[in-house]
């Protein structure tokens, strides 16, 4: 995801490019162009768009998708302009509350964003047009969404490369769960805590993350678990990591849900003051028999440029090419053959 914009450019831009059937090397420049367009629009409206209640990927993903496909096909400026305008007519207006309610259909909005960008290009090629000023004026899309796009503002960077602050998720789960997951692993490494002796867990964090404080019900639907700070924290504290295998077998581990029900999430004024530049969280664990609670704080930033796949935090090391390859192989184990895994690693290296 793009830390400075709250969006996930890969999920809306890569599907259309990969579906084109072109050689991977031919997709690199169009991908970068698509990333830059959607990222800069996202950055210009972040975190206001999220706080207003909408998902940045659904809003700005179609624009990036359309521009990337136009770049791939070397379309003329007139086609690009109309494709962008059409993509801003009725993009999938993803409601952020659906993420917080753990609605399992939510991941589909990435695909809708990708498809709408592709459709916009087809319509533009056919001669259809969009608005002359799709991003400005009263009742434009930004106006209706309650955000502003001032292209003279310092918040909109027209130089530099936003792609350098698009980072790989180092672990399974919503990005807003990651600070708490890191805290859980740090606790597991530093203190041998008897899980059943834990009486309560208090996590203090920024306001947006409060929306991910629900505990999954007894069904433990997959998306609900991935979007739950209590569940992700508990799974990491018990097992040290959330793996595809653990997700598959989650019903065999009722202790995760039992611990998750003891987790409470609170707003921290300090963490809120640092959001969105960094995703900060503090945890306090009350353990039976211990006079004082166990306390740790995590500072996790995705806003600074790095050539790594994920920057370091207080408890997690930086995520380089070797770490990414190792993680990929580990996640593929038991899902696809070792031979196919190595082929994919060689293909994308």
Name each model feature, range by range.
Residues 1-164, 174, 209, 349:
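N-terminal core-entry segment
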Residues 1-6, 102-115, 122-349:
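Terminal-appendage/accessory-domain detector
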